[in-house]
Amino acid sequence: KEKFMLGVYVMIKDKTLYDLQNLVRKLVSDKNSIDDVRSFLLQLIFCFYCEESGIFLGKPFTQLVLNSEASSFPSRFMQLIASLPPFMAKPQQLFLSDDTHHAMKKLCRISWNDVNPSIMGAVHQAALSRSDQRATGTHYTSLRNVHRVIDKLLIDKLLDQFSETKSAEEIAVLYEQLGKISVFDPACGGGNFLIESYLGLSAMRLIASRGISSVKPLSTRNFHGLELSEEAACICRTALFATARLEEKRYAEQFKTPLSPVDLSECGDIRCIDALNFDWDKISADYIVGNPPFMFNHKEQSFSQTQLFADSASASVDYSAGWIIKAAQYCAAHPRTCLLYTSPSPRDGATS
């Protein structure tokens, strides 16, 4: 429990979200299970995003938090979220003390429009036990390290191209180009790499849209992910959906256009599947990014790696080496660019 509370704090690293850490501490003190606390936090965060992006009109969740009693909140909350996607509507046996309910009210003061939706992946990751992390090779990638990859691979190059663009015609071409770029994370987890790539491209596209008559927000359909965990894949889809909806609201406000109806398909192309047994050529992408799972000498890796390394004596290297080989094969067959955040060597145990 202490690890979960610390994990949420360390992964968020945002002083404005101290109140969220405080709520976690109180929920755990109320003897709620870690799984129930995690599910509730994800639902709570998603509800705030729904209010910020216009999915919930009239801020019904905020009104529920502010106007309900601690004893009645759990049942009324379940009624509110019944219409959400199935993963977000998961019921919990939640107990709230008056003190915990008061701590929740403080979250209503936060401007969630300014909070990165990758926080959802951080909450999910923080709740995983050490044994779960070892079993799946799952490791949280900080936003700093995410940008070490995507800035070098994608963003910096596009910024250079943007700075060299002079005429209105060239800017219009760049605007169209930014809308067609596709990004692929074959070990996407909660979606940090895809979310940050989307936000970077969307920000540049918003700047390039000046002078263009018909402007549309960036679609998530060109953001592809593979993930073995169904729960992590659901979180990735949900976070991408929230990200896209917040960006759509930003576009609507800047260009003074009506906010379009909710499109539930705007949640990326995220597939729950074993990436090493999947044919990557079924996905058309310009850039490959990510942090492959690391679990050296793990028994479950044998089948995938035995097939992948059938022509070599490399089956004893770490699971993450499979992603490196698959990425190399993928790039060799097509003109694509790849940068993965992995261990210093596929035989080492720490990432860098």
PLM feature spans:
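Short, basic/polar, glycine-containing "phosphate-handling" surface segments that engage DNA
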Residues: K1-C50, G54, P91-G121, R130
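Short helix-capping/linker segments at secondary-structure and domain boundaries
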Residues: C50-T62, Q133, D160
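Extended, well-ordered alpha-helical scaffold/bundle regions in very large, multi-domain proteins
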Residues: G54-Q79, G190
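SAM-dependent methyltransferase catalytic region
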Residues: D132-S343, R347
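Ala/Thr-enriched low-complexity intrinsically disordered regions
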Residues: A350-T351
